[in-house]
Amino acid sequence: MLKSFRGGVHPDDSKKYTANKPIEIAPIPDKVFIPVRQHIGAPTSPVVQKGDEVKKGQLIAKSDAFVSANIYASTSGKVVDIGDYPHPGFGKCQAIVIEKDGKDEWVEGIPTSRNWKELSVKEMLGIIREAGIVGMGGATFPVHVKLAPPPDKKVDVFILNGAECEPYLTADYRSMLENSDKVVAGVQIIMKILNVEKAFVGIEDNKPKAIEAMKKAFEGTKVQVVGLPTKYPQGAEKMLINVLTGREVPSGGLPADVGAVVQNVGTCIAISDAVERGIPLIQRVTTISGGAIKEPKNILVRIGTTFKDAIDFCGGFKEEPVKIISGGPMMGFAQSNLDIPIMKGSSGILGLTKNDVNDGKESSCIRCGRCLKACPMHLNPSMLSILGQKDLYQEAKEEYNLLDCVECGSCVYTCPAKRKIVQYIRYLKSENRAAGEREKAKAAKAKEKKEKEEVLK
């Protein structure tokens, strides 16, 4: 048995609702609402206009920035609006609304057929960048950036994250069972790009069928499939790297600092589709689950489908949910309405009942220390939450390693005072980012002033 990481928690995995449900293809809704911001990095700008006819797989928004990701039409039809619409992370965001024409026709040239073994690393990275692929476990970092580490970072191991440790979510689990050929191709493509010979597939040991399926799929390769102790957040990058390689990502560091790159199952499938068939990222497997959902399912759904349309495909609600979550219950975000769209990083939609939710009235920290024991990053969550209440982001960053927090929610799960620790930490991070932007603007203004003074001399 592998040694586990320090900290973590053991919530009920609640995967019984959908673990044995094969992936179903969701119908294409009458309209898709495709946000231009679905990734970490520079936002994209529309390259289509209201009234344009578009095909499935056609580029509709792009950015010339390196850290960004193209956006594509998820079906064919007419662009009926470009404006601000509900967004799961930003409240409202510019989105391109496409009314389907019922034909679902591909843009010319897609799909195609390519042998990845005959492509150069540069060609494959270009294809992945063009296809708009991001990390599909929720982080949504552009994959072409992650697969091109700086020359001074010597990567020697790739890790496929098959842990899927968030309760309720089974999209990756079903994908490993049903699309193992694409998973294998995606891993092999990544290994060629990174020029590594060592790779691991890490899967929690509460998924024996997935472990068996992956061992069979990777038989005869240099990829090692490993059953991991079931403990949340086993699927966090830094935890996976530590358990599988013994390496510890330093404070403020990245996986590449210790020679590792991690991607999840859905991302590998998207890479296979793009490199082998030329298909951009226009759909994904998403879990629709929770006690309020009438027929929980794993669905292959088009980007831009609203939560309402996805839930309706699952029979709607059997009772009024007390909470709707985008993602999983530990790291996901509560939503106030069902008009928001499924995006590239939408791993799940949860409709939770009162019995599903461990909510309660928040009170002051009682200094019990449970959150410190649960934190896998060796932080002091209680102090960070207190600093969040006091708006002391600088102190949180410099003295309590704010930016090392992975927002896993283990602290919240263990807190008897029901403190919203992760919310405070997210607030501190947002304030820190805002301060950084203010400093950049101040420096730019000072530089401009100095240049003007030089001209006038």
Swiss-Prot record:
InterPro entries: 4Fe4S_Fe-S-bd, 4Fe4S_Fe_S_CS, Ion_transpt_RnfC/RsxC, Nuo51_FMN-bd, Nuo51_FMN-bd_sf, RnfC_N, Soluble_ligand-bd. Keywords: 4Fe-4S, Cell membrane, Electron transport, Iron, Iron-sulfur, Membrane, Metal-binding, NAD, Repeat, Translocase, Transport. Induction: Up-regulated when grown on H(2)-CO(2). Its cofactor is [4Fe-4S] cluster. It comes from the Bacteria. Residues 433-457 are annotated as: Disordered. Residues 353-386, 396-427 form the 4Fe-4S ferredoxin-type domain. One of its GO terms (molecular function) is 4 iron, 4 sulfur cluster binding. One of its GO terms (cellular component) is plasma membrane. [4Fe-4S] cluster 1 binds at residues 365, 368, 371, 415. GO terms for biological process: electron transport chain. [4Fe-4S] cluster 2 binds at residues 375, 405, 408, 411. It is found in: Cell membrane. Binds 2 [4Fe-4S] clusters per subunit. Its EC number is 7.1.1.-. It is a peripheral membrane protein. The complex is composed of six subunits: RnfA, RnfB, RnfC, RnfD, RnfE and RnfG. Belongs to the 4Fe4S bacterial-type ferredoxin family. RnfC subfamily. Part of a membrane-bound complex that couples electron transfer with translocation of ions across the membrane. Couples electron transfer from reduced ferredoxin to NAD(+) with translocation of H(+) out of the cell. Essential for energy conservation during autotrophic growth. Contributes to ATP synthesis during heterotrophic growth. This is Proton-translocating ferredoxin:NAD(+) oxidoreductase complex subunit C. It comes from Clostridium ljungdahlii (strain ATCC 55383 / DSM 13528 / PETC). The lineage of its organism: Bacteria, Bacillati, Bacillota, Clostridia, Eubacteriales.
